[in-house]
């Protein structure tokens, strides 16, 4: 009999990366383990199985991997949210806050139809700057963002609370204390 997969132990932690004092949560080890990847996707999908979801929006880059798998499981379309200048057609953009300043992300202007139910998916939520920007971008196009889903939450950084304050429920599979 197969032993149950512990998602937390499937994620590698790299100390002092990308700078001293940071504990980097490397999800590539989970993605490379077929059983762990499958379990993570199944758990992200489970609350919405049987629910009408029009689109899954994934943030560059690991949100593309997870979001594509979730979209497939839910028979929903997939919408990439990218850094400014990376999409080839007419776009809508939004500026968002990072720990170290501002950045911009964009989405194709025709990626979401007003009223579509969208779930935002990414690998990790920390301060919530990127996810807050993505929610704002989707809402700018008229989407109803029904949830934001992450494999990892770093609750000490408060990002999930920022998303919930926007009226968007947050689902995270595991959490790591600290940064």
UniProtKB/Swiss-Prot annotation:
Its EC number is 2.4.2.7. It catalyses: AMP + diphosphate = 5-phospho-alpha-D-ribose 1-diphosphate + adenine. Its main location: cytoplasm. Keywords: Cytoplasm, Glycosyltransferase, Purine salvage, Transferase. Gene3D superfamilies: 3.40.50.2020. GO terms for biological process: adenine salvage; AMP salvage; purine ribonucleoside salvage. It is an enzyme of class 2 (transferase). NCBIfam families: apt, PRK02304.1-3, PRK02304.1-5. Homodimer. Catalyzes a salvage reaction resulting in the formation of AMP, that is energically less costly than de novo synthesis. HAMAP family: Aden_phosphoribosyltr. Belongs to the purine/pyrimidine phosphoribosyltransferase family. This is Adenine phosphoribosyltransferase. It comes from Beijerinckia indica subsp. indica (strain ATCC 9039 / DSM 1715 / NCIMB 8712).
